């Protein structure tokens, strides 16, 4: 486990930075008085229940077909962290929005909890499109997707094989496959990767024999002098009143922490392969100019087909775009979806 912990310091992914920094309009738990919220549940193709919060404008005309957007949360988070904020802000602009909990997280089904399964995560986006397509007030030809952090890569993966997703946007995207294989800025060596995989397979056998589940560190539970700048960034969101949230029935100290034994599934996850086949459906990649994750949006943009846009937010880091309403380019997202879901 020591080898694994050392490697996690190199990987530093976004499932997860002493008081919460509430600057630049940080408002994760925003509540709009202009929209209605309804909890909904629907099946994915694996017959697992996916739970989401459905937001509709209070002044929406339900006798006509309206555009809709599926929104996915950061990896290791739940819909109450970042996704609900984006969903409400976009619903205020006239969209039907659906913020989902990915399978194995939050209120969605999946045992054991916190298991990594990018294939199922991606199917959750398609299942959300299934659900929205059956609502009488939603136009099934005008459904877009928005993935935040790790969900950006799941949304891209889903869109490659689901042409019903007419417009695809990502914010502070992580390529969850690349960051596990290579670390940030390709800082992980092949030998370190092999040691990482070995730790996971050894733990898998422990669990098969009835042993306790082990989790990868995710966001640290407390800071010390050795805590990295990236982890401090996540700590300020996930471990403070700014964005901390513990789903019912879970332990606070385990939030953001995926199962160690399942990390091999990210090693085999290549969401940007064939990304160009999404064209001619439009793609928008939003990242901050200070974001440690910027490399992933730049890579996706380079490999995607037209039409595409890389939108860089000045002065914004990775986690800033989770909840800092003075930095999040809601106007850009609104114009992108209005133009491409009309």
Predicted regions, residues:
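Catalytic histidine neighborhood in serine/cysteine hydrolases
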Residues: 304-319
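N-terminal cap/lid segment of alpha/beta-hydrolase-fold proteins
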Residues: 21-64, 322
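The serine-hydrolase catalytic nucleophile loop
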Residues: 76-88, 102
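Alpha/beta-hydrolase-fold enzymes
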Residues: 156-240
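Conserved alpha/beta-hydrolase
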Residues: 89-109
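Short beta-strand/loop motif that positions the catalytic acidic residue
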Residues: 278-279, 284-287
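Catalytic nucleophile-loop/oxyanion-hole region of alpha/beta-hydrolase
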Residues: 79, 105-141, 323, 327-329
């Amino acid at each position: 486990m020591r080898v694994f912990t050392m490697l996690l310091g190199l990987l530093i992914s976004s499932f997860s930075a002493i008081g919460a920094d509430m600057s630049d309009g940080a408002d994760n738990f925003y509540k709009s008085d202009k929209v209605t919220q309804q909890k909904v549940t629907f099946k994915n193709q694996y017959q697992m229940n996916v739970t989401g919060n459905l937001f509709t404008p209070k002044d929406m005309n339900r006798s006509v077909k309206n555009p809709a957007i599926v929104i996915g949360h950061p990896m290791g988070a739940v819909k109450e962290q970042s996704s609900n904020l984006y969903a409400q802000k976009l619903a205020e602009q006239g969209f039907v929005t659906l913020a989902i909990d990915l399978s194995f997280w939050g209120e969605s089904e999946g045992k054991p909890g916190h298991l990594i399964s990018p294939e199922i995560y991606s199917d959750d986006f398609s299942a959300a499109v299934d659900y929205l397509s059956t609502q009488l007030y939603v136009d099934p030809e005008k459904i877009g997707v928005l993935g935040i952090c790790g969900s950006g890569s799941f949304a891209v993966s889903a869109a490659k094989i689901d042409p019903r997703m007419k417009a695809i946007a990502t914010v502070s995207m992580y390529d969850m496959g690349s960051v596990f294989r290579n670390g940030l800025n390709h800082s992980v060596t092949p030998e370190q990767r092999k040691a990482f995989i070995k730790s996971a397979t050894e733990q898998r056998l422990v669990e098969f024999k009835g042993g306790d589940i082990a989790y990868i560190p995710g966001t640290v539970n407390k800071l010390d002098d050795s805590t990295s700048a990236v982890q401090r960034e996540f700590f300020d969101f996930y471990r403070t009143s700014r964005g901390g949230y513990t789903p019912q029935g879970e332990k606070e100290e385990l939030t953001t922490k995926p199962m160690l034994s399942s990390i091999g599934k990210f090693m085999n996850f290549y969401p940007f392969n064939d990304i160009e086949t999404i064209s001619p459906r439009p793609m928008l990649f939003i990242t901050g100019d200070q974001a440690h994750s910027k490399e992933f949006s730049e890579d996706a943009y380079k490999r995607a087909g037209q039409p595409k846009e890389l939108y860089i937010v000045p002065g914004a880091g990775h986690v800033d775009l989770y909840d800092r309403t003075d930095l999040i380019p809601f106007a850009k997202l609104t114009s992108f979806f209005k133009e491409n879901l009309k």
